[in-house]
Amino acid sequence: MIRTLNIAHRGFSGMYPENTMEAFKKAVEIGSDGIETDLHITKDGVIVICHDETIDRTTDGSGFIKDYTYRELTEFNAGHGEKIPSLDELMDYMKDKNLLLNLELKNDVIPYENLERSTIDKIYEYGLKKNVIVSSFNHNSMQKVKKYDSSIKTGLLYGSPIHNPGEYAKRIGADALHPLFSLVMDKATINDIKRNGILINVYTVNEKSYMKKLIDLGVDGIITNYPNLLKDVIEKLTDK
């Protein structure tokens, strides 16, 4: 039985405009176990979904998210006629799905005030606490989340090696590590992390050979732009 979760990175972003409702809905339709997405705050305090601090790469507009109101942001095309969604839109869609929702707080470049508290309030509002894991490259932010509510699951993102990652996560008080997948391609590292009771959700895995290897190693979740490919890998391994 394969227990590795299939987590759609920015939705089904390999085929549809990333971090749009279209990408999220397509990920759910093809059978993903969860969605990973990215949160920023607008000038008027609305939590919105976008990977970058600016809208230049993903829309037909330009400038920093923090300098726009939410209404102003909705004027831009994020691909296929889609708009930049609010967290409310995504949570309203996900509230009855019983799927994982990985909310990455994008506060490692711009230290948005109250992003942690505002995100937690939305988790409560939509009754999604048991479905959500909050992650960030800003590990101090994850400690702040735990201070607000120790029962909310947190994941530490990292793209370069951490000494004794399992012990580090335990010391920080996190539930999971979210490493760049190439950092945990050996059984010893996986075992060390799991020995400390820490979950491992790796990013961003888009090739079937790596997906299979990581499943064999026992990671808990794989974050991918192509949840359709990962679904195929999991089904083939399950059929063996």
PLM feature spans:
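Phosphate-group recognition and catalysis centered on beta-loop-alpha active-site segments
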Residues: M1-K240
